[in-house]
Amino acid sequence: MDKFCVQGPTRLSGEVTISGAKNAALPILFAALLAEEPVEIQNVPKLKDIDTTMKLLGQLGARVERNGSVHVDASDVDVYCAPYELVKTMRASIWALGPLVARFGQGQVSLPGGCAIGARPVDLHISGLEQLGATIKLEEGYVKASVDGRLRGAHIVMDKVSVGATITIMSAATLATGTTIIENAAREPEIVDTANFLITLGAKISGAGTDKITIEGVERLGGGVYRVLPDRIETGTFLVAAAISRGRVVCHATRPDTLDAVLAKLREAGADIAVGDDWISLDMHGQRPKAVTVRTAPHPGFPTDMQAQFSLLNLVADGTGVITETIFENRFMHVPELIRMGAHAEIESNTVICHGVETLSGAQVMATDLRASASLVLAGCIAEGVTVVDRIYHIDRGYDCIEEKLRRMGANIERIRGE
């Protein structure tokens, strides 16, 4: 397995171009299964999960190629099962189920894998599809969906806010008969992006980005060209990199309007922030960040995918900061690794209390999930001495060329190839 070797400490300063959003590109690629004509998807990041998704679409019978953009032609899809071999590494594969049953009347997806972050049940996806008229069975480790004829529009009230299930229901409902209303829908920018992609193909969707989405079913979806929005979590990660190292960064090709909660907390931590239409600059003017209190929440609240990075910020900040995780259980697995580097913290249930220290020390640490692994790499950049981050395949699932971008900010980081 590959690992990163990071020599610190470094004040990270420079300019970074942000890639397309993984959490929008994945559902958009799966939603391309709904289209009877070719689609071109631009600004798709180069990530392990994207490669897996493209391979999966190919196994279903779609023609998929990448030459800058990703081109998907699902007109000849003739396989309706997403097998365990591909699905085992990636939770997002559940997004194949809705488009398959909506367009072809049947679909099977092996129960998915992915990051080890507590319970992420597929129950809400299943319940939503059942309310649209699908019959669902769980057999031999597979979720099997079928419907006679077409799915039927329904008034669906989500039991809890779920990004993944909102996308599944919205995508499937585009080809249902009649009108579907999703109440208590998730509001994340990636849902808006997926809706806009579907609208480009001819879907009739309104209200995406609010807690009530309305979908008027259509007979078919055609082709089109769509550009994926910038990755707000990658943007936030590089902003934190500059903040914890008392440095400066300009993030280009990003969307400041998707990061209001994160920018507010960075300003509270003492960062000097400026924004334009497609850029954000952060300058610490050489000052240590101040500890902040963070509580994760569904959008437009503070994103859970920035929690690990802000845990690190608090652990090197001036003062004591409290972080409460309300979205996922078991999402503080990075904290014991940071304690190995000299951080002071206590975990109490879904809260971590961070006592800021002046410096961290390099150590051998292990990545446990995508965002946790990013925080360990950033910690290595500011720690005294050498940090080795193991199991970085987690990072490759969600960050496009993170070491190259950190090097542009001055980091001394090297990828050591595994056997």
Swiss-Prot record:
Residues recorded as bearing 2-(S-cysteinyl)pyruvic acid O-phosphothioketal in the entry: 115
Compartment(s): Cytoplasm
UniProt: phosphoenolpyruvate binding residues: 22-23
Catalytic machinery residues: 115 (proton donor)
Presence of keyword Cytoplasm: yes
Any one GO cellular component localisation term in the record: cytoplasm
Catalytic activity, reaction form: phosphoenolpyruvate + UDP-N-acetyl-alpha-D-glucosamine = UDP-N-acetyl-3-O-(1-carboxyvinyl)-alpha-D-glucosamine + phosphate
CDD domains associated with the record: UdpNAET
Main location: cytoplasm
Source domain of life: Bacteria
Pathway where it operates: Cell wall biogenesis; peptidoglycan biosynthesis
Residues that hold UDP-N-acetyl-alpha-D-glucosamine according to the record: 91, 120-124, 160-163, 305, 327
Pfam families: EPSP_synthase
Protein known as: UDP-N-acetylglucosamine 1-carboxyvinyltransferase
Organism listed in the record: Sodalis glossinidius (strain morsitans)
Organism ancestry: Bacteria, Pseudomonadati, Pseudomonadota, Gammaproteobacteria, Enterobacterales
